[in-house]
Amino acid sequence: MAQLTREFLLQQEIEVVMEVEESRSKTITTKTYSSIFFGLQFNYIYLGWLVWYLHKDLEKARDYLYLATCIILDMFQRDEQHEAEIGSSLLGLINIHASWHALVANAPDLAVEVMKKTCASNIDQDKNFWWLAGECSIALIEGDESAAQGYCNHILNGPFPSRYAPTLRKNHEPFGKMFQAILDGNLEALEESTLAVARRNQGINTDGMSFYPHIFVLGVLKIAQMYGLEIEKYKPRYPKELLHLPKSDFSHIDRWWERIEIHPA
């Protein structure tokens, strides 16, 4: 079975490379720009996973993740609707697709690099959850617990823009509790908060998010592991609830957990 799976993934790698080459060879017009490059960034992310999982080629995986991030940034900088700023949902998408994948692939230095670039590009910093989450993650990865606590407090308690305050407080709280659990070294609280995020986002799209928080949780767990929290203790129960996602949209996600090396490489 393992050999069949490997052969299947090797074939997938070949097919995705062919898709990438085909997309890159197309004549790009304004009308097709977004669709072509949106597909490219997903393919680069998938290739990053494949080369890491199949060949343990971390350098190539980093290259693919970096390319995916650059494509997203370039695409939205060309988009008239986003020319003035990188909005909240986009910042989240960039951080999720590149930073958290890099974390899970044991490349925290790349994760920090991507987070810093995306956070620096965002104008609406005081209101943006993903900016706060990115800065909090950077601080944790770099060992600055004092700064991390400050960002965590902001995620949990605001200040939030007045007209959005009730909704933002409700939406941010379970995410903030994950960071707080890491800072407190509390495995039980981490498990409770991660499951709360998973349950809250099962099959729904809240604040422009659908499956993104689930990948975000995997990145947070990787940070928790850096702080000595033994996340493998509840591994058998956790993924089943976390990865309850619409099969038609992201059926591959339920296999990602099996590829995560619980112990750092």
Which stretches of residues belong to each language-model region?
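Eukaryote-skewed repeat-based solenoidal scaffolds used as protein-protein interaction platforms
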Residues: 2-201
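Long, ordered, amphipathic alpha-helical scaffolds
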Residues: 175, 179-265
